UniProtKB/Swiss-Prot annotation:
Residues 20-299 form the Protein kinase domain. Its EC number is 2.7.11.24. Its cofactor is Mg(2+). Residues 345-400 are annotated as: Disordered. This is Mitogen-activated protein kinase hog1. It comes from Blastobotrys adeninivorans (Yeast). Activated by tyrosine and threonine phosphorylation.
Length: 400
């Protein structure tokens, strides 16, 4: 049986196996506290997320089970990877994943991003979403703080605690307001993978302008400022509104015409504006999907269809409608953890034997490039709890 060590972090007891040392707080994720640590077995830095009181209610137990199942199933270069999981003697659950140096929120609040970084980050976000959506999963909470980045500009989407089945009748109040798709505000029930594309579009716009595009104070103000830019929703979208109060609110809005995004982003690459126009569309049925967005001319320097994989099978959501007691969820959780430890070593071995796909060239330099045609790059963070800093000057190059 593994030895456990107790440490107090921000007044919270972290009870982890002795394999992990040098704990430092990173921040709060969805329903959990995250710390960085060093894995003595691999000598790699990792992130450890404590799921607080996972068995206190059936709802929390089910949510934790869902996140574990998703982390086990979703394996992609642009998604956070689960490397270990354990239940402590106090019956808290800990997810161990790779540690990246910073997140997109920290980068955006530190300085403007240069064009090639915006382009490469958006490509990786959409590459990850293409895979997630192909598995029948909707992230539902895509935002800059859920997009992790290392010093080599490798990007990974994290925090699948709110992810749900790909289902047009999903319900609930989800996603951070600034990045929330209008169909969520209009109906709160009928939405699908397109909500992630809207969120990615809002993130794309924020990278281009350096601040949120739709900083709503509440959901009414949020929807109002969306219409100030995109105009009133078309009639066929209004017809889908299920709530009478929401319908009356939308009809009461003043008549507004769509403003071309080229006016909002006068200095942006025309291809970037064109792609953004296709992502920020009121009607989710007409919104571009992840696969088509990857093929857009704006992302041509990185687009490689053979290196943009989809899931080999759909995620099994058969448990999602189950209404089970905590003890049953606990047994199911233990079963999943045992299964993870039984199969993970063979999966890693198999992955190591497979040839790695070609990656965009990212070079570590101590000084900016000397060629005049290559602009100086922003430095990426090396520490997860510090503002963006360090000696890295990554050079982003198109695929050869």
């Amino acid at each position: 049986m593994a030895d456990f060590i107790r440490t107090q972090i921000f007044g919270t007891c972290f009870e982890i196996t002795s394999r992990y040392v040098d704990l430092n707080p990173v921040g709060m994720g969805a329903f959990g506290l995250v710390c960085s640590a060093r894995d003595q077995l691999t000598n790699q830095n990792v992130a450890i997320k404590k799921i607080m009181k996972p068995f206190s209610t059936p709802v929390l137990a089910k949510r934790t089970y869902r996140e574990l199942k998703l982390l086990k199933h979703l394996r992609h270069e642009n998604l956070i990877t689960l490397s270990d999981i354990f239940i402590s003697p106090l019956e808290d659950i800990y997810f161990v994943t790779e540690l990246l140096g910073t997140d997109l929120h920290r980068l955006l609040t530190s300085r403007p991003l240069e064009h090639q970084f915006i382009q490469y980050f958006l490509y990786q976000i959409l590459r990850g979403l293409k895979y997630v959506h192909s598995a029948g999963v909707v992230h539902r909470d895509l935002k800059p703080s859920n997009i992790l980045i290392n010093e080599n500009c490798d990007l990974k989407i994290c925090d699948f605690g709110l992810a749900r089945i790909q289902d047009p009748q999903m319900t609930g109040y989800v996603s951070t307001r600034y990045y929330r798709a209008p169909e969520i505000m209009l109906t709160w029930q009928k939405y699908d993978v397109e909500v992630d594309i809207w969120s990615a579009g809002c993130i794309f716009a924020e990278m281009l302008r350096g601040k949120p595009l739709f900083p709503g104070k509440d959901h009414v103000h949020q929807f109002s400022i969306i219409t100030e830019l995109l105009g009133n929703p078309p009639d066929d979208v209004i017809e889908t509104i299920g709530s009478e109060n929401t319908l009356n609110f939308v009809k009461s809005l003043p008549k507004r015409e769509r403003i071309p995004l080229s006016q909002k982003f006068p200095n942006a690459d025309p291809d970037a504006v064109d792609l953004l126009e296709k992502m920020l569309v009121f009607d989710p049925r007409k919104r571009i999907n992840a696969a088509d967005a990857l093929a857009h001319p704006y992302l041509a320097p990185y687009h490689e269809p053979s290196d943009e994989p989809v899931a080999s099978e759909k995620f099994d959501w058969s448990f999602n409608d189950a209404d089970l007691p905590v003890d049953t969820w606990k047994v199911m959780m233990y079963s999943e953890i045992l299964d993870f430890h039984n199969v993970d070593s063979s999966a890693v071995e198999q992955q190591q034997q497979q040839p790695q796909p070609p990656q965009p060239q990212l070079q570590q330099q101590q000084q900016p490039p000397q060629q005049p045609q290559q602009p100086q790059q922003p430095q990426x963070a090396q520490q997860p709890v510090q503002p963006v800093q360090g000696d890295y000057v990554p050079q982003v190059a198109p695929r050869s």
